[in-house]
Each structure stands twice: as structure tokens, then as C-alpha cells.
Amino acid sequence: MATLQATNILTGTTEGAKYNATGSTSEIWTVATTTALASGDTISGPVIPANTYLVDVLVSWTDVDSGSGATFECGYTGTLGAFIATGNTTPASGGIVHANVAGALGYTATTNTTVLVTMTGTAGTPVAGTCRIGVIYTASP
């Protein structure tokens, strides 16, 4: 299993949690997938700050599989499919998927939470590409 680290699309670095006391905060992180993604590989993305409320998680893929085997889920340590359900096929064709699991909207935790994208199926015919992970959260629900 490989672990990839996404970086903030604006700064090119990994960053800790941050939020705006009013309104909402949006972040987009990106990672190049130059090698074949296999089932169990994980991409570490943005951090949802403690005591904030999740509005949405978005994951965008270029077509990283000219076959049809690449699937993923999105969540956090201990609950990897908390935001986007296990087996999503977007990496096999490219596109964008939003949070689609009950309880994702309004998710909150008492500690900073790193968003994780985990492959649940291996690419049949791997293609180098890009995965972008976006989060939107607010301090006031």
C-alpha cells in the first residue's frame, strides 16, 4: 500500500487546520498520480479543523484508468467511507463527486480531522493523472 500526500493547490505545501470565525472556508489540495493506484493506497488531503462543521467534500479525478477497475472512498481514519461511499467509480472515467453519505453534511469532531481518499479497487489499465480534494467547512452551522 502506498500513501500519497496532497498539497494545497495555492501554496504547494501541506498545512495545518485553519478557519474563518464567520462564513465558510474552502480549500483545494492536489496530488499527481504518476504510478498505478492500487486498492488500499491512501491520499492524505486537507484538514477539517476541530469544532467546525463540514459543508461538503469534493473529489475530482482525471481519468486514471483506461479500464474500469479504479474505485475509491473518502473519509477519515477509522471511517474511510464517511463522506463518499466505498466503491465510487469516478477515477475510472474522470469527473467530480461530492459527499454522498448520510451524516457527511454537518460532520464535526473535537480534534482536527485529515480527509483521506482511499482506493478500494485497483486500476485495470493505469494512467498517470491528478486527484484534487476539496473541503468546505464553517465554524457556525
Tell what function each PLM region has.
Residues A2-P141:
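Surface-exposed, low-hydrophobicity beta-strand/loop segments enriched in small/polar/acidic residues
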